[in-house]
UniProtKB/Swiss-Prot annotation:
Interleukin-16 stimulates a migratory response in CD4+ lymphocytes, monocytes, and eosinophils. Primes CD4+ T-cells for IL-2 and IL-15 responsiveness. Also induces T-lymphocyte expression of interleukin 2 receptor. Ligand for CD4. Pro-interleukin-16 is involved in cell cycle progression in T-cells. Appears to be involved in transcriptional regulation of SKP2 and is probably part of a transcriptional repression complex on the core promoter of the SKP2 gene. May act as a scaffold for GABPB1 (the DNA-binding subunit the GABP transcription factor complex) and HDAC3 thus maintaining transcriptional repression and blocking cell cycle progression in resting T-cells. One of its GO terms (biological process) is leukocyte chemotaxis. The gene is IL16. Keywords: Chemotaxis, Cytokine, Cytoplasm, Nucleus, Phosphoprotein, Repeat, Secreted, Transcription, Transcription regulation. One of its GO terms (cellular component) is cytoplasm. This is Pro-interleukin-16. It comes from Aotus trivirgatus. The lineage of its organism: Eukaryota, Metazoa, Chordata, Craniata, Vertebrata. It comes from the Eukaryota. Residues 139-153, 199-209 have a biased composition (Polar residues). The keyword Repeat applies. Residues 30-270, 320-347, 497-520 are annotated as: Disordered. Residues 406-502 are annotated as: Interaction with PPP1R12A, PPP1R12B and PPP1R12C.
């Protein structure tokens, strides 16, 4: 049913009918009736009257000019008189009441959600409010918009506070009054948005006790009993909010407090694991501990000695007699003899010789032959060690078995004397983060200290430098230890020469290094069986017809320059003068030893076209397979 009336301004000289006056009767609040919030909403049939929008009793002007509140008994016998103003006085007074009510909710913490039923009629005027003037409706709209936009809150926070105020506001109502009605006062000002179904489901799932079903927007609901404002019945808002926040913080702090204990329990370090590791690396760790102990002890003793001591007083073999050729150098190192180069380079000794001195300290061991200075070198090292360190070393040696004692023959302690800031004369290869796990000597520089001393050779495993063990270190850490050895005036390097018999016993990861060193040793021994010949090739625009491999600084270390493969259709293929694997000694009168592959290729390209004389070294069929393994 449509209750729309004429929206023209009310004429003060026209008599107001009783039915319109009954709409503003105060019985609306006494009989718990409510004006519908929507324009076409159905009226409450139980009460038979409609509630005023602001909940205040209407007032009309009497003959004396005073406003009088209408009562049901007096509604039929009201004295009418001519008005003194274009607008009735009761309208102005009711508007003042609306303004007073509008100022009250601003004192609450959440003004946008206060449960006042009054402002609903401002946005959606009913039949009685459409008879008012357009100017008064604009004022009411301004007040409504001011109240609405004055409270700017986020939707999610508003939904949380909405559920809290619903729980406090509806606790005083009977259960039966929730049926078929809407949430009172939630949409009172009209500008506040209605609850979406998703938000209502969130309120229901959050466990709020006041979250009720979604109301039908077309059905009205009775307000609470009494004329007191609904905000007076609300308990303080922060209390339930603090409860929700406390529960959320407890839930969030629960797993955070458990994190340290879980982390501590997830990484245990048991004794069984450490014992297994010790059992697996027992032999290797003993060798490393002995070498590191000797290295650190000698290094400490050297640092304590005055710098004026010259090491030329140590008896030794001159450099010229000690290393006439590379083969004699390797043989002397394998036999355990210590070699020194002169007064300023240093000396070296075998750990097996040091063991003999530790077993018989009181007995003076004399050298049988005069061609080596190992007893003097061993005695000098013994003199560097303190009594406590010497006792520890004796205990370590006594606990070793025969197999481990034999491995001491390949371990050498080299002491180098140098200037501050000078390098040791060799580079390192390998590391725990690389394919070759063992730290080895990659290259010995020709004019460096290690080359002058003669003990440290390419392919030797480096156990420690200046008392710092290199076992299990990465490549960068090993290089850092090598750079730190530049500062002192002395350097103590413990190296081990790998052999095919001892390499698998020490560590399985040294197999590759042992095979490479063994192949290089065999290639040195098989030099006597190799044949050196001179061939002549035709140099054309495409080169000599073969490619090179090896050279200084190659991927496999410093290797001799050899022929890799022969190109098809070349003159060298047809003549069969050269073969893959032949080592190039001289090319057009230029020695090729010590050159890189790039330098050798530049020499070949610079040659003029024509015949070129090449001196090659070809190994016999018996020893040809072994050096190929070393080159691979």
């Amino acid at each position: 049913m449509d209750y729309s009336f004429d929206t023209t301004a009310e004429d003060p000289w026209v008599r107001i009918s009783d039915c319109i006056k009954n709409l503003f009767s105060p019985m609306m609040t006494e009989n718990h009736s409510h004006m519908p919030l929507q324009p076409n909403a159905s009226l409450s049939e139980d009460d038979g009257t409609q509630g005023h929008s602001d909940g205040t009793p209407p007032k009309l002007e009497t003959a004396n000019g005073t406003s009088k509140v209408y009562r049901p008994a007096d509604s039929s016998a009201v004295k009418k008189g001519p008005p003194v103003a274009p607008k009735p006085a009761w309208f102005r007074q009711s508007l003042k009441g609306l303004r007073n009510r509008a100022s009250d909710p601003r004192r609450l913490p959440d003004p946008a959600l206060s449960t006042q039923p009054g402002p609903a009629s401002r946005e959606h005027p009913g039949p009685h409010t459409q008879a008012s003037s357009s100017s008064s409706s604009s004022i009411k709209q301004r007040i409504s918009s001011f109240e609405t936009f004055g409270s700017s809150q986020r939707p999610d926070r508003g939904a949380q506070r909405l559920s809290l105020q619903l729980s406090s506001g509806e606790a005083t109502k009977p259960v039966g009054k929730h049926e078929g009605g809407r949430l009172p006062g939630l949409l009172g000002r009209g500008a506040a948005p209605t609850l979406a179904p998703q938000e209502t489901e969130q309120l229901l799932s959050s466990g709020s006790p006041a979250a009720s079903e979604v109301r039908d927007p077309g059905v009205s609901e009775s307000p609470p009993t009494g004329r007191q404002p609904s905000e007076k019945t609300l308990p303080p808002g922060p209390d339930p909010l603090l409860q929700l926040l406390s529960t959320q913080t407890e839930e969030s702090q629960g797993p955070v407090l458990k994190m340290p204990s879980q982390r501590a329990r997830s990484f245990p370090l048991t004794r069984s694991q450490s014992c297994e590791t010790k059992l697996l690396d027992e032999k290797t760790s003993k060798l490393y501990s002995i070498s590191s102990q000797v290295s650190s002890a000698v290094m400490k003793s050297l640092l304590c000695l005055p710098s004026s001591i010259t090491w030329g007083q140590t008896p030794c073999i001159p450099r010229e007699g000690a290393s006439a050729t590379s083969s004699s150098n390797a043989d002397s190192a394998a036999n355990g003899s210590a070699e020194t180069s002169g007064s300023d380079t240093g000396f070296s000794l075998n750990l097996s010789e040091l063991r003999e001195y530790t077993e018989g300290l009181t007995e003076a061991k004399e050298a049988d032959d005069g061609d080596h200075c190992s007893p003097q070198s061993g005695q000098s090292v013994i003199s560097l060690l303190s009594s406590e360190e010497l006792k520890k070393l004796i205990e370590e040696v006594k606990d070793l078995d025969e197999a481990t004692l034999k491995q001491l023959d390949s371990i050498h302690v080299t002491i180098l004397h140098k200037e501050e800031g000078a390098g040791l004369g060799f580079s390192l290869a390998g590391g725990a983060d690389l394919e070759n796990k063992v730290i080895t000597v990659h290259r010995v520089f020709p004019n460096g200290l290690a080359s002058q001393e003669g003990t440290i050779q390419k392919g030797n495993e480096v156990l420690s430098i200046n008392g710092k063990s290199l076992k299990g270190t990465t490549h960068n850490d090993a290089l850092a230890i090598l750079r730190q050895a530049r500062e002192p005036r002395q350097a103590v390097i413990v190296t081990r020469k790998p052999t095919p018999e001892t390499a698998p016993d020490l560590n399985s990861s040294t197999d590759s290094a042992a095979s490479v060193s063994a192949a290089s040793d065999v290639s040195v021994d098989s030099t006597a069986e190799a044949t050196v010949c001179t061939v002549t090739l035709e140099k054309m625009s495409g080169g000599l017809g073969f490619s090179l491999e090896g050279g200084k600084g190659s991927l496999h270390g410093d290797k001799p320059l050899t022929i890799n493969r022969i190109f098809k259709g070349a003159a060298s293929e047809q003549s069969e003068t050269v073969q893959p694997g032949d080592e190039i000694l001289h090319l057009a009168g230029t020695a090729m030893q010590g050159l890189t592959r790039f330098e050798a290729w530049n020499i070949i390209k610079a040659l003029p076209d024509g015949p070129v004389t090449i001196v090659i070294k070809r190994k016999s069929m018996q020893s040809k397979g072994t050096p190929a393994a070393g080159d691979s």
